[in-house]
A protein has these predicted regions:
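Acidic, glycine-enriched active-site microenvironments
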Residues: 1-89, 93-96, 114, 119, ...
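Gly-rich Lys/Arg/Thr-decorated short loops/hinges at beta-loop-alpha junctions or inter-strand turns
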Residues: 19-22, 26-27, 45, 147-161, ...
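Mobile "lid/hinge" segments at catalytic clefts and subdomain interfaces of large enzymes
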Residues: 83, 97-141
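Conformational gate/switch positions in structured elements
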Residues: 85-87, 138, 319
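Proline/glycine-anchored alpha-helix kink/cap motifs
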Residues: 88, 104-106, 177
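Flexible glycine/proline-rich, aromatic-decorated loop/lid segments
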Residues: 90-91, 95-101, 235, 311
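Membrane-interfacial segments at transmembrane helix termini in multi-pass membrane proteins
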Residues: 120-180
Length: 337
């Protein structure tokens, strides 16, 4: 019982001030985790084999309990080794697992409806997982096994980022927004955490009335789960036709006057294209740095989930507007009105 106890203690980061247990976003890389997971899987197979060999009720229930316990431990050790940036893929993959389990149950019970529904859930989850892994230039086993780096990572020393960043205030940003004609907003998980979608939606509505072309660029793995940002923007009343996927909008950045990055980091990291030794090399990102002017709205200069410095922060056409996203967007909205 010592191993599961150690896993649970390491997995949860207790914060008394928040008065609840919060999951630690950093991956839990246990020593020998691959060997441990392999042993747990073999134990599951062994329990299943014994279940078929011994038809007695006692043996069957014992093996069922054993398989349940081993599967629970393996579920924790597998999922905990995956970083926060890969959680959207984990969610869709677990969704796919549940579908195939339902499909197998349908076969066992000779229930066609369960089989069909399970196949639909399993295939849709698998397709979503594939789409997001392709967007990150990674394979599904690479994500599920808690590995780092894309298939294009050269393996050398990452480039060092030199220079200083430029900071602007709300008044400077309002002036840039007023002077811009074409504006693209790229939200990330920080927008959802701060609940800034409502002032952003109202600001976009005002800018559209003033004749400005404002659109949103959404990365496939942006947010805490698939489609989270699309849902948040729709909830706030943003029209569907101005919310575009990465492939639809990436070629338009070079013709954009102003780019507003709100709470995004890894999904707009230019190191994916500029540094072949970066662990995110080859990952498909939103090319926001091609815009004439970039304003990055973040709480701080800290790195994202991938723990990779973002060269965009130090580019000559980029400036940082630091602070809480909702408070900043509220201030921008009040000055634009």
């Amino acid at each position: 019982m010592r191993a599961p106890t150690m896993v649970i203690k390491l997995l949860f980061n207790m914060k008394p001030s928040a008065q609840r247990a919060q999951l630690n976003l950093s991956p839990l890389l246990l020593p020998g985790r691959h060997a441990m997971n392999s042993a747990l899987m073999l134990g599951n197979v062994g329990a299943m084999g014994y279940y078929f060999l011994d038809p007695s009720f006692v043996a069957g229930m014992s093996m069922l309990r054993t398989a349940t316990a081993l599967s629970t431990i393996m579920g924790v050790t597998l999922t905990a080794a995956i970083g926060g940036a890969d959680m959207p893929v984990v969610i869709t993959n677990l969704n796919s697992y549940s579908g195939w389990a339902l499909c197998a149950e349908g076969f066992m019970l000779n229930n066609n409806l369960m089989t069909i529904v399970g196949a639909l859930i399993g295939s849709s989850g698998a397709i979503l997982s594939y789409i997001m892994c392709k967007a990150m230039n990674r394979s599904l086993p690479n994500v599920i096994l808690g590995s780092y780096g894309t298939s294009s990572t050269a393996g050398g020393k990452p480039m060092e980022i030199t220079g200083t960043h430029t900071e602007v205030n709300v008044d400077n940003t309002v002036e840039m927004i007023t002077n811009a004609k074409n504006i693209i907003i790229t939200p990330g998980s920080g927008l959802g955490v701060a609940k800034a979608q409502y002032p952003v939606a109202e600001m976009v509505s005002l800018l559209n009335i003033k004749g400005k072309n404002v659109r949103f660029g959404i990365h496939p793995v942006a947010g805490r789960m698939p489609g989270q940002l699309n849902i948040l923007l729709a909830e706030a009343g943003v029209p569907y036709d101005v919310v575009l996927e990465m492939d639809e909008i990436n070629d338009d950045f070079k013709e954009t006057d102003l780019e507003l990055v709100i709470g995004a980091n890894d999904t707009v990291n230019s190191a994916a294209e500029e540094d072949p030794n970066s662990i995110i090399a080859g990952m498909h990102v939103l090319k926001v740095w091609l815009s004439q002017q970039v304003i990055v709205m973040k709480r701080s200069m800290a790195v994202g989930y991938a723990a990779v410095d973002n060269p965009i922060f130090y580019k000559p056409n980029a400036a940082m507007l630091l602070g809480d996203a909702k408070e900043t967007c509220d201030s921008l909205l009040s000055k634009i009105k």
